[in-house]
Amino acid sequence: MSKLNKSIVAEFESAQITRELPKFSQGDTVVVNVKVKEGSRERVQAYEGVVIATKNAGLNSSFTVRKISHGYGVERVFQTHSAIIDSVEVKRRGKVRAGKLYYLRGLEGKAARIKEDLAAAAAAKAARLAEKA
């Protein structure tokens, strides 16, 4: 792609990226409020789980959330800048060292737990309090 085309694409993407989501990474437990359309009605459905992967690619960014529902592992990939995402709330900050947590697919029960990153949680809480003041 030529430099002109790349600059046009970059300008278009920056105009499309309007929503600010909270900072989260792999290992964090998040609640994603998703807009669901049923017939003529539209409602908001909460999807809570652990972020196991993120893909940072500008407008094409996405993240994968995994949860256990009735004993079965369920994963859902969300486009970060999608219109169906109403909001994202970070419940817990996880302390992990791997970039992608695909190994959680093979674990179950207590083995699939992730330690909480208390330092990051305290820093986030302090930032929220400073923002309100």
Swiss-Prot record:
Give this protein's Gene Ontology molecular function annotations. Answer: structural constituent of ribosome
Q: Which domain of life is it from?
A: Bacteria
Q: Which Pfam families match?
A: Ribosomal_L19
Record flagged with keyword Ribonucleoprotein: yes
Give the GO terms filed under biological process for this record.
translation
Which spans are transmembrane here?
A: none
Keyword annotations for this protein, in alphabetical order, are: Ribonucleoprotein, Ribosomal protein
Give the GO cellular component terms, alphabetically: cytosolic large ribosomal subunit
The UniProt record lists the keyword Secreted: no
Q: Which PROSITE patterns match?
A: RIBOSOMAL_L19
- Spell out the InterPro entries in the cross-references: Ribosomal_bL19, Ribosomal_bL19_CS, Ribosomal_bL19_sf, Translation_prot_SH3-like_sf
According to its UniProt entry, what is the function of this protein?
A: This protein is located at the 30S-50S ribosomal subunit interface and may play a role in the structure and function of the aminoacyl-tRNA binding site.
Family affiliation: Belongs to the bacterial ribosomal protein bL19 family.
Q: By what name is this protein known?
A: Large ribosomal subunit protein bL19
State the species of origin: Stenotrophomonas maltophilia (strain K279a)
